[in-house]
């Protein structure tokens, strides 16, 4: 199996397709990253102060360029979430293998950024189904961690249904994480 950094796979499940983010996604992703209802649900932990609230095309372009450089450096993969049927780009996910001197060494971090009107259980379930089926092997991780703040009720329901359990301690100094292990 090729590394996700050699050849980035396209995944599909239910309502969505995931494919590597590129500059063609710029304008539609700006709708997600400028959505003031969505931004509080994004996981910006350990992102050097970036809260992912982008309000200009130029700032969105810079983010996509950074994601591309990070991909080339094998730091993380950022996929665009495309709603099938409408071919609408509704957000992104990020996934990476975490190396650390703590109990979550060799776990993956999954970030899910969705436009607020698409922050619904069925779409999140499809994202998690892809994650559960492919990401453990693709990223060589023994568990996947993702964040869901308490008011993210649809996300929390989807996480529990997909076998994720709350982590009742801080992860990298932060609260509100859920984990699924192999």
Question: What name fits each language-model region?
Answer:
Residues 120-134, 157, 161:
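Conserved acetyl-CoA-binding loop-helix of GNAT-fold acetyltransferases
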Residues 1-117, 150-154, 160-182:
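GNAT-family acyltransferases
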Residues 137-148:
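Conserved GNAT acetyl-CoA-binding A-motif
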């Amino acid at each position: 199996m090729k590394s996700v950094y050699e050849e980035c796979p396209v995944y599909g499940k239910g309502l969505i397709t995931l494919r590597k983010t590129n500059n063609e996604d710029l304008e539609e992703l700006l709708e997600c990253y400028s959505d003031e209802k969505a931004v509080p649900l994004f996981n910006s932990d350990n992102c050097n102060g970036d809260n992912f609230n982008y309000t200009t095309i130029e700032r969105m372009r810079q983010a996509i360029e950074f994601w591309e450089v990070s991909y080339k450096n094998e730091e993380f993969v950022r996929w665009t979430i495309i709603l099938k049927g409408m071919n609408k780009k509704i957000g992104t996910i990020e996934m990476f293998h975490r190396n650390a001197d703590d109990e979550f060494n060799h776990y993956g971090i999954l970030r899910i950024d969705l436009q607020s009107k698409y922050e619904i259980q069925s779409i999140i379930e499809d994202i998690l189904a892809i994650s559960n089926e492919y990401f453990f092997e693709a990223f060589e991780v023994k568990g996947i961690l993702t964040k869901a703040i308490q008011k993210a009720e649809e996300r929390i329901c989807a996480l529990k249904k997909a076998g994720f359990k709350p982590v009742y301690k801080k992860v990298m100094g932060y609260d509100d994480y859920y984990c699924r292990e192999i």
